[in-house]
Amino acid sequence: MSAPESSISPVPPPGSSSGGGKKLDSLPKEDLVKFAKKQVAHVAEMKKNQTALMEKLKAKMSELEQVKKDAENLKLINEKLTTESAKKVENNPTECTECLSKSGALIELEKEVFEWKEKATRADMISLELRDLESKVDQLNRALRDKTEALIKAQEVITENDLEVNNMKKEKNNTKSSIEKLTEENTRLTKALQDEKIKSADFEARLRSAECRIVELSDQQGNEKLGLARKMAESENRGRILEEAVDVLKSENEKLLAKNEEFSAKLVSSEKEFAEFKKKSHFVLEKKGKQEDETRKAIEKLEKSKVTITELEQQADQTRQEHFKTVEDLASSRDKAERLEKTLKVLKSELTESEKAHTTAIDELQSSSSKLIQRLDEELRLMRSSRDTAEQKIKDIEIAKEKVDHLLQNERQRSENENGSLKSKLSSATKQIHSLEKELQELRNDFETRRIQSNQHQQQKAIAAVVPQPIQLPEHPIPPLHYQRPAVAPSDSVSCYDEPTQPDRSLEDVLYGDLGDEYRVESDELSEEKFKVILDQLENLKKTNHHVAELLSDAETANGRLTTQNSLLKDEIRRLEREEKREAELSNEKNMEYLKNVFVQFLKPESVPAERDQLVIVLQRVLHLSPKEVEILKAASAHMATAQAGSWSSYFSGWSGAAT
């Protein structure tokens, strides 16, 4: 019973015949031919099912008649046996034993009668089923009548089409050759379709490789950022170190200036002494050799300092070269990104060309013949599905491209900002280096002048200690206390009475100096030790700077990971909240009915775009949609407003009967 019922098509509603006639009138000829062929096949299936059902009905009716006849015969036999047994008991009461023996047979007969009654009830059930089948057959007959009417119309259309076909045959006798050409073209198109499938696979592989390249470029850019950050930190540390060195040099310069002032004050006194002891300069010539050796040592130390300055300048040049290298790397990364964009554009153009080729092939196949169309329907469906998947992939690629473009723009802005900061820092570093060079030159000049002054002072001391002048006593008597001394010119010789003389010093004190001597200068060994200490401090600062930069990069990566996890968790929480609200809204049956009406109103072709926009707001409130889903609904409403009626009728063909 279930097999024929499943093959029966649903009965159309009573008001669908007029609407069906209008639809048939509006359909084109090719669609009418297809519809008529489908209806003929459906009617043939219905006839086959009807003949099988009629045969089954006849067989079951014959079985029922036999069962009824057997039941009537059994009833007659039972009545005869009961009457005979009653007569025998009345006539011969001694023959009860025989009656008892026959009562067993009667009981068996009663059982058989009960079984036959059950069979009769079953036959009644079968008769009810037969009535149901008859009602279904009536419904099928009605459906057949409707379909025969549609077939008559279709046959009329077919006759018209046959007439037109005959006319076309009379006009065109070379259709066979064209059909052969079309078959050849179809074979060629199938080959082209296979080639295009291969090309689409190649395009997918290229797209995957492009995605891998984009990922590699993003990794390279991240590594370049880390390198730039490290170089920035190193340049900052170098600037700080240079600033500290400048501060140290400034402090030393201030000390030297203070000493210079002291030396200048002492030089004034030494010049006065030198005027007194000009003639006592013999031992100075012997000590000039030693002093020249000391000056040579000082010059060598100055050359060492010059070498250190050149090394610092080389380091600054290296930093500049590294900066230029980073700028070139950024330019190369930009070129690579532009190349990727060009490849994506080429892929898009190729995809559009392939879609155009598909559409042209589909049009040619549809115009070729109905048989080829039926064969190629499945292939077209597959191609459409592949095209949809390709479009979805293209959309995903476009979204990824937009993301990559956004990231590239951000990275370009960051790189530009970093380059600007690097340029400013480099300019400041160069300025500091120039200022340091100037200060070093000034310090060298001051050092040389102080050396000369100290040498002259020591020479004067040596002359004063070794060759003392004879003391000239005044010819006139000692003046009284209130006597004023006349002014003496500076060129005149000064006597012992004019100024207080210093105590006499030995030659060893003058040559080697005393421990408490004010004119003693710091040794060069101490300055070298200070320079080594400063270099060690610089190396330690570089190491700490490198370590801090690595810690900063690790912290930045961890921070980025935490931000992504935080955003994902927030999105998941929002989605769960929307799901809970949606379940609370849809738990009520009234809301479900309201939502069904909203969907039906949204899908009606008669609705205005403004109404659809309002319905989108209602759906957003009831279903608690996300912003992306709202945008999708708005895009669908806009597409429904701009699309043709024929393009949407295929998607919503089953809604016409439901809406009524």
Curated annotation (Swiss-Prot):
A Pfam match: Rab_bind
Cellular component terms per the entry's GO annotation: Golgi apparatus
Statement: the UniProt record of this protein carries the keyword Metal-binding: no
Record-given protein name: GRIP and coiled-coil domain-containing protein 2
Region of interest called Disordered, as start-end residue ranges on this chain: 1-28
Coiled coil: 30-92, 115-464, 517-596
Record PROSITE patterns: GRIP (PS50913)
Gene symbol of the encoding locus: gcc-2
Keywords: Coiled coil
Annotated ranges, domain GRIP: 585-636
Keyword Transcription attached: no
